[in-house]
Regions:
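Arginine residue identity/basic-tract feature
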Residues: 8, 50-52, 57, 88, ...
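Generic serine detector
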Residues: 14-15, 33, 41, 76, ...
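Terminal-proximal interaction/regulatory segments of ATP-powered molecular machines
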Residues: 266-371
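Alpha-helical lid/collar subdomain of P-loop NTPases
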Residues: 154-313
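Bulky hydrophobic/aromatic packing residues
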Residues: 6, 40, 53-59, 120, ...
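Phenylalanine-focused residue identity feature
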Residues: 16, 40, 62, 71, ...
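AAA+ P-loop NTPase catalytic core and its hallmark functional loops
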Residues: 1-172
């Protein structure tokens, strides 16, 4: 996802990014103030009675199947017309109608507003397309580098499948937070210095927290507080980031597998509504992985029992969305088939549990209200 480094002049923003360049990772630097909109949107050319957009030369620096970094330096010197042209480059990753290679990362740098001379404030739409990070050099680090030299930066790698699973894990937790704080979905750009909350920046946050977790920066480790705070603030703004991280650290949730295997009986009265929502979303994720497994039948028993307890506790509305999501898969059909294969007695028990849930009068009333 695109990153914007904010720092005073001379602190090494450009040097660091350009220092990442090697044969497999070309870095192309474009200084915003010396380019016009067509350098980012393409130049319209009439050809055979039709207008096409000629691709700027800098795009050729990147191969179709290779990695690279597009570095947009001095971004705050870009006039509004150039900023508008950059919107598509930064978020849609297209120069005119020409897509950037998938391996190209987009990084920008800018001076803080109080240090800008003759610059332009970034428009809210452009700001919202970046993760914003403050960049500075502590004195002790600079002094150390004078005698020992600068360490070369490295780009960490994260396995895509592992990230997809971890992303889902944090998406359910963020969904739980937004159930408690629905107004946090959006924030006023004018009330935040750089990043501000929007559905897009919440997507960024989930992806970054998932990546951080895989790289060892875990939510409940106090040593990682500053790293996670900087990343969340860069997406959402400081106030929302503080609330989110506090929520994530204080979640009281049992391991979903322990619940599904019957090793843990969930104390419903100790869980608030957001925690119960997150728990059921996590249980769903595990059950959906077992649709073709022999574990589906024994694991569904505790799930149905817990859902029944939540209904009796008057919390149908809390688990309605996760329950509906699971029911929209082949879960019920496969569960009934496995129950039938297990014999008449087991089939009767499973059928009774399912019918009890989905014929519940309170659930029907809740659905009617939603309709």
């Amino acid at each position: 996802m695109p990153v914007l480094l904010w720092g005073r002049p001379g602190v090494g923003k450009s040097s660091f990014i350009e220092g990442l360049a090697n044969e497999q990772l070309p870095v192309t630097t474009l200084i915003a103030s010396i380019h016009d909109p067509t350098d980012f949107s393409g130049l319209p050319v009439l050809e055979d009675g039709r207008v096409r957009y000629a691709v700027p030369r800098w795009v050729d620096d990147f191969t179709d199947d290779g990695d690279g970094i597009l570095f947009l330096d001095e971004l705050s010197t870009a006039p509004p017309s150039v900023q508008s042209a950059l919107l598509r480059v930064v978020f849609e990753r297209k120069v005119g109608f020409h897509p950037l290679p998938s391996g190209v990362r987009i990084v920008a740098a800018a001076n803080p507003p109080d240090l800008m001379v003759g610059g332009w404030e970034l428009s809210p739409p452009l700001r919202n397309r970046f993760v914003h990070l403050d960049w500075d050099i502590p004195t002790d680090l600079y002094v150390h580098s004078l005698t020992s030299g600068w360490e070369t930066g490295e780009l960490p790698e994260v396995e895509a499948k592992a990230h997809a699973e971890k992303l889902r894990f944090f998406q359910t937790r963020i969904a739980g937070f937004l159930r408690v704080k629905p107004d946090a979905l959006h924030a006023n750009p004018e009330e935040n210095k750089y990043g501000f909350a929007s559905p897009r920046s919440w997507d960024f946050t989930a992806a970054l927290v998932a990546t951080s977790d895989l790289l060892g920066y875990r939510i409940n480790d106090e040593a990682n507080n500053q790293v996670l705070f900087e990343l969340a603030t860069g997406c959402l703004g400081e106030a929302t980031a503080i609330m989110l991280l506090e929520y994530l650290r204080n979640l009281r949730l049992p391991d979903p597998v322990d619940v599904l295997t019957g090793q843990v009986i969930v104390p419903l009265e100790e869980l608030d509504d957001s925690e119960l929502f997150v728990l059921f979303a996590g249980l769903n994720d595990h059950l959906k992985k077992e649709l073709d497994s022999d574990r589906l039948l024994p694991w569904s028993d505790p799930y149905l029992a817990l859902a029944g307890r939540a209904f009796k506790d008057g919390r149908r509305d809390v688990i309605f969305v996760p329950l509906k999501e699971l029911a929209s898969t082949t879960w019920l059909v496969r569960l009934m088939a496995k129950g039938q294969a297990a014999g008449p007695e087991k089939f009767a028990i499973i059928s009774a549990s399912i019918n009890s849930l989905f014929s519940d009068e309170g659930l029907r009333e809740f659905i009617e209200v939603l309709s």
